[in-house]
Design a protein with these regions (language model features):
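N-terminal alpha-helical targeting/anchoring segments
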Residues: 1-135, 153, 157
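TRNA-recognition modules of translation machinery and tRNA-sensing kinases, especially anticodon-binding
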Residues: 27, 130-429
Length: 429
């Protein structure tokens, strides 16, 4: 969440940033925060003054008792008792003001970086780079869901039988290709200096709050009511929460972590032609990269993450472009975000396969993730960054469609050492 220091010292900048994100009622929300913070500070001052007065009178009581001036001491005791009652009431008022303030701050998104373009939705996103070659497919080219049926690679109907829509069954060589992609992505991350971790796939409420999924996205998360745990929508959640309530030595930054996980998203309300096949699933596999860094270095880290993801797409030989998201299309927590999309030649559409974001100090403020300066020993909020490197379903869809032949689907050369075959077909054994 945004810091009170930022809101109070740069109020107009914050309001303009929220308006750039098309956050309704930006000025009213910030005015409410400042008003509640004023109440909190005034209540704190009253409480401090009351406690100081009670302490002063308590000292007088001690002195009077030593002088055996019992009546005077008893009279002051009544004043102290009244001050204690007042302090209790003020403590309750202070606790309420602090809770109200936290609640308000949690409803306010991060403000965008100056480089974020103006815009309301995806139509206003800006293409900043393109790469790869769009293949020319024959007129009778099939979409990936038809190819998967033809070569017995994925059974969508069986997934519906077992669980429901959006939970496909991967078969034979396709199951092996899934593992190959995960291994390839993790190995490439390791080569780039990321330490692999294997996190839980369920998290508690504090973890969901720390990374900003709660209370903003609880409707999109699967909730295990009995234990009050949530299935993760991305490995960003457990990996970043490793550093919750942690003070990191400056010399240890940047911290680089990567993790494979299954991801679970309800995607409530999703339907229609854009969700066919692998285009939108409730469960999918993804490799996530996460960085913790200093404010001075975080944008260099962002550029390195963008280069890493782009390198993966080049090795997979997929046509891609990189979008800088406009203010209105950005997530709740991000300060700047880049989407990578690959071209699905049979569907004739672009599919998002990665989002790479710098959240600056917004997430770290919730997480209480700080670093200690080497020279001054003072602590400061870290910057957190994350990105998909990569999400599998749409990558698989593009590989299947773009590399289709009458005999099967050609496997990208970089994956052959990981899966042990160069053609996806129904010869599964």
């Amino acid at each position: 969440m945004l810091t009170l220091k930022l809101i109070s010292e740069q109020t107009e900048r914050v309001i303009k940033g929220l308006e750039k994100k098309h956050f309704n009622g930006a000025r009213e929300a910030i005015d409410n925060v400042l008003a509640v913070d004023k109440t909190r500070r005034e209540t704190q001052q009253k409480l401090d003054k009351t406690l100081q007065e009670a302490k002063k009178l308590a000292a007088q009581i001690g002195a009077l008792m030593k002088e055996k001036k019992t009546d005077e001491a008893n009279a002051i005791k009544e004043d102290v008792a009244q001050l204690k009652e007042t302090s209790k009431a003020l403590e309750q008022e202070l606790a309420k003001a602090e809770q109200d303030l936290t609640t308000l701050l949690c409803t306010i998104p991060n403000i965008p970086n100056d480089d974020v373009p103006e815009g309301k939705d995806a139509a206003d996103n800006v293409v900043v780079k393109e790469g790869g070659v769009v293949p020319e497919l024959p007129a009778d080219a099939l979409c990936h869901w038809d190819l998967c049926k033809k070569f017995n690679l994925i059974n969508f109907d069986l997934g519906v039988k077992i669980t429901g829509a959006g939970f496909p069954i991967y078969i034979g060589k396709m199951a092996r290709l899934q593992r190959a992609l995960e291994a390839f992505f993790l190995e490439e991350a390791r080569k780039s200096g990321y330490l692999e971790v294997q996190p839980p796939f369920v998290v508690n409420e504090a973890s969901g709050y720390g990374t900003g999924q709660l209370p903003d996205k609880e409707g999109q998360m699967y909730h295990c009511n009995l234990d009050n745990l949530y299935l993760i929508p991305t490995a960003e959640v457990p990996v970043t929460n490793i550093f919750r309530d942690v003070i990191i030595d400056e010399k240890e930054l940047p911290i680089k972590r990567c993790a494979y996980s299954a991801c679970f998203r309800r995607e409530a309300g999703s339907y229609g032609k854009d969700v066919r096949g692998l285009n939108r699933l409730h469960q999918f596999d993804k490799v996530e990269i996460v960085r913790i860094d200093t404010p001075e270095h975080s944008y260099q880290s962002l550029n390195e993450m963008l280069e890493h993801v782009e390198g993966l797409l080049k090795k997979l030989e997929l046509p891609y472009h990189i979008l800088r998201l406009c203010g209105g299309d950005m997530s709740f927590t991000s300060a700047i975000c880049y989407d990578f999309e690959v071209y699905s030649a049979a569907q004739k559409k672009w599919l998002e396969v990665s989002s790479v974001s710098n959240l600056e100090s917004y997430q770290a403020n919730r997480l209480k993730c700080r670093f200690r300066h080497t020279e001054t020993k003072k602590t400061e909020l870290c910057h957190t960054l994350n990105g998909s490197a990569l999400a599998l379903p749409r990558i698989v869809a593009a590989i299947i469609e773009n590399n289709q032949t009458p005999e099967g689907i050609r496997v990208p050369k970089c994956l052959v050492p990981y899966c042990g075959f160069d053609m996806l077909d129904d010869h599964n054994f």
